[in-house]
């Protein structure tokens, strides 16, 4: 399936690139999310006429992500969880918990922006967490998991 990208997509391409992807990825993710349109002759022509508009929109999205990244620099959040005396959590702390904690602290964050390379945290301690705010913008924050009982 051939598509024209309307914004930069990680590991795929940049704005305006014509890419070939598997039909399911295009039909179920890229097109509904507004990240791409089918590469028909009419869509190619329409894209070229609106290219400056799409580039301006992409630049504002990037600028917003960069300003959010500066707000997250040096930020940390403490999450309390039930834990045993050895420090093992009875549950786990995942992306949703981290996103909710930052949002409660006044820094809005979506769970899809939280990248946990080794999975959810199952022990008490301090962790560095990568936030993927945009295809070009990543930042690291500190998450402290402590026992609340």
From Swiss-Prot:
InterPro entries: Ribosomal_bL9, Ribosomal_bL9/RNase_H1_N, Ribosomal_bL9_bac/chp, Ribosomal_bL9_C, Ribosomal_bL9_C_sf, Ribosomal_bL9_N, Ribosomal_bL9_N_sf
Single GO term (MF): structural constituent of ribosome
Keyword Ribosomal protein appears in the UniProt entry: yes
Statement: the UniProt record of this protein carries the keyword DNA repair: no
Cystine connections: none
Cellular component aspect of the GO annotation: ribonucleoprotein complex; ribosome
Annotated keywords: Ribonucleoprotein, Ribosomal protein, RNA-binding, rRNA-binding
SUPFAM superfamilies: L9 N-domain-like, Ribosomal protein L9 C-domain
Listed Pfam families: Ribosomal_L9_C (PF03948), Ribosomal_L9_N (PF01281)
One example of a Gene Ontology biological process annotation: translation
Coiled-coil region list: none
NCBIfam families cross-referenced by the UniProt entry: L9 (TIGR00158)
Function: Binds to the 23S rRNA.
Stated family: Belongs to the bacterial ribosomal protein bL9 family.
Listed name of the protein: Large ribosomal subunit protein bL9
Gene transcribed to yield this protein: rplI
